[in-house]
């Protein structure tokens, strides 16, 4: 049996565990706003991942928008190294879910299984993805205990409100730096067979163009800053005339 076949078999054997883990995560109502039960779900994940041999670290985003003693912004990062520290594959999922809303036919926090699907607030976005990451990592380690590299799994806060108390807070402190992480997989709900390059990062900048004021009757005596900005925008647009490779 090939390695791929062994992995597929191991994952299939954990199907019930995957469903159960998804249900247990759904049962922790991490609604955002306001940011309920972040500590509870991080502690749950800490128990699960440490039991699988991961070293875990819980990080509160002190001072981040929304963080307070009533609603602390907690995150968890778990790491397991094989024979070496690199390459490191990091699985990131957010722990928060949006408000419940109306029109439910089942308890939104029960994780009801019906017609082969798990129903509940966050089942798709993205506690199912988090559970899949954990079960996949555990299955891989069971088949390849002496793998080369490292696996990280994170549960981060506040994705539904900008991520300032979650991914952004951790990124500013080097948790996703190239020195630590080589690849990131984010199991957001797209399509079960769709894997895509979804995020290249962001570069924030302030660009200022300058001109010279003149009377509207004699614009040729001035220098229009807006026109210069238009030229800048035209050059920026040229960067996106074709898809990136």
Write out the residue ranges for each language-model feature.
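Alpha-helical metal-binding/catalytic segments enriched in His/Glu/Asp
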Residues: 91, 118-160, 209, 220-237
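Beta-strand secondary-structure signal
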Residues: 75-77, 152, 204-208
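A short, acidic/glycine-rich surface segment
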Residues: 64-65, 98-100, 192-196, 216
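Conserved small/polar residues in nucleotide/adenosyl-binding loops
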Residues: 240-245
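Acidic/histidine-rich catalytic neighborhood of metal-dependent amide-processing enzymes
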Residues: 126-200
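Metal-dependent peptidase/peptidase-like ectodomains
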Residues: 184, 193-228
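Generic recognition of short, well-ordered alpha-helical segments
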Residues: 36, 40, 131, 165-166, ...
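Acidic/His- and Gly-rich active-site-bordering loop/insert found
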Residues: 2-118, 142-148
């Amino acid at each position: 049996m090939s390695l791929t076949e062994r992995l597929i078999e191991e994952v299939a054997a954990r199907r019930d565990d995957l469903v159960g883990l998804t249900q247990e995560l759904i049962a922790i109502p991490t609604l955002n706003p306001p940011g309920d039960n972040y500590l509870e779900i991080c502690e749950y994940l800490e128990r699960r991942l440490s039991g699988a041999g991961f070293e875990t670290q819980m990080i509160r985003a002190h001072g981040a928008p929304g963080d307070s003693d009533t609603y602390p912004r907690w995150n968890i990062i778990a790491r397991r190294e094989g024979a070496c520290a690199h390459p490191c594959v990091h699985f990131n999922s957010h722990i928060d879910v949006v408000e419940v809303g109306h029109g439910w036919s089942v308890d939104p926090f029960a994780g009801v299984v019906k017609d082969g699907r798990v129903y509940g607030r966050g089942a798709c976005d993205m506690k199912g993805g988090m559970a899949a990451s954990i079960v996949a990592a555990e299955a891989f380690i069971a088949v390849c205990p002496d793998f080369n590299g490292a696996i990280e799994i994170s549960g981060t806060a506040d994705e539904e409100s900008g991520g300032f108390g979650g991914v952004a807070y951790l990124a500013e402190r080097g948790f996703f730096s190239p020195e630590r992480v080589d690849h990131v997989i984010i199991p957001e709900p797209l399509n079960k067979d769709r894997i895509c390059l979804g995020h290249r990062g962001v570069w924030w900048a302030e660009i200022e163009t300058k001109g010279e004021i003149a009377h509207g009757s004699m614009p040729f005596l001035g220098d229009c800053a807006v026109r210069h900005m238009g030229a800048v925008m035209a050059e920026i647009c040229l960067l996106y005339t074709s898809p990136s490779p």
